[in-house]
Amino acid sequence: MSDITIKIDGKECKAKEGEYILNVARANDIFIPAICYLTRCSPTLACRICLVEADGKQVYACNAKAKDGMEITTLTENIAEERRAIMEVYDVNHPLECGVCDQSGECELQNYTLEMGVDEQHYAIRDTHKVPQDWGLIHYDPALCIVCERCVSACKDMIGDSALKTVPRGGDPLDKELKNSMPKDAYAMWNKLNKSLIGPAKGDTLECTDCGECIAVCPVGALVSSDFQYTSNAWELTSIPAACAHCSAGCHLYYDVKHTSIDNPEPKIYRVKNEWNYVSLCGAGRFGYDFENRTEGKDETAFQKAIEAFKKADTIRFSSVISNEEALILQRLKEKYGYKLINEDAKRFQNFMNIFSKTTGRTLYSADLNDVHHSDFIVSIGAQLKSDNPRARYAFNNAIKMNKGAGLYFHPVKDPVVEGFGKNLICINHKPGLDTVSS
């Protein structure tokens, strides 16, 4: 894509031709409100508050692409009226339980209601009873749901599970007279909102890989972790940046911490968060944090037994599912005490790398997952992406969905999740041990 120049509120902005106006504005520190849009997902036009004026015509910044010389105005009297009406509609029948809602203090509905100056309500419709649902690790409260569809988009475009969809809401239809009296976009958004809720894509059970990304992207308190629900207020927590210790991918995350209880000042991890516009977590990273709260790993007797075992051993056999830090410890032990390190997986991978380099004249270490995200053709050999490296799976799926890419997936075990990425992906299930042949 070629470089272009556009003007947003009089400010010259460099952009790539075809880049969404919303992303150009964000890159240049220009505020355009948006609830439904996620950077790594397809636009859904669910919220419509990203309305702007481009060359005199109203467009949606999340879906309209920048063109050279385009002049954009982010706020006019009509746009302000539309945005305010949209936020009023979102607030219709929304439960006034902010004091106990798990999202209170970091709720985008709260923030935008204040941002748009909504201090009175002009609209109403009879509410319907909506029963909360528990989907394993996830709690869904449809009464709090604003149907922004971020969870649906994340599950499809980021993760690849496609486990969520919009389902019929039921209840009274909107008064037809509202179409003539309300701002156009506010009415269209309300009409859609009034017909829909979020539900499992297949039956009544949520069939997914339990990554919890839908919880992370939810702007309100509709989707929360069942373990975190009603345990803490957001403003009581201290976010500690860290790297996930469950595998060598080292995903960036935040541990939200506070004291264990009123009579126990020891810090405790209450939940894990991530920068979902840039990186997604797997279920291990998001939900597997309680090992830090337990005391088993602090057993001095067990630790001494492990030390004695190391003293007697001359060989260490280990699995590939270890962190970079653990691998470094093994290397240091080998250098200092002369241990033999045995890992069958690593040996097979070494053989594969030798064959790959001889065949292609290239090394696999010349790229990272960010390059996968931006690729249009990907080949995966030897790894069961669903469990071996979920982040690689997310990148694979995202490239196929967002770049209209294609790919080949080689593995002995059939994987319905990977097969569901798209029609341009060919999955080849071969006999075990033929990975090097496929290269």
Residue ranges and their predicted role:
Residues 2-6:
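Short structural boundary motif marking the start of a folded domain
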Residues 8-11, 54-56, 258:
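Short strand-turn-strand beta-turns centered on an Asx-Gly dipeptide
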Residues 11-19:
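Short, contiguous acidic and Ser/Thr-rich linear segments
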Residues 19-24, 65, 323:
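Short, structural beta-strand-to-alpha-helix junction motif
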Residues 21-55:
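A basic, amphipathic helix-loop patch mediating RNA/tRNA/ribosome contacts
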Residues 91, 95, 148, 153, ...:
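Catalytic alpha/large subunits of respiratory electron-transfer oxidoreductases
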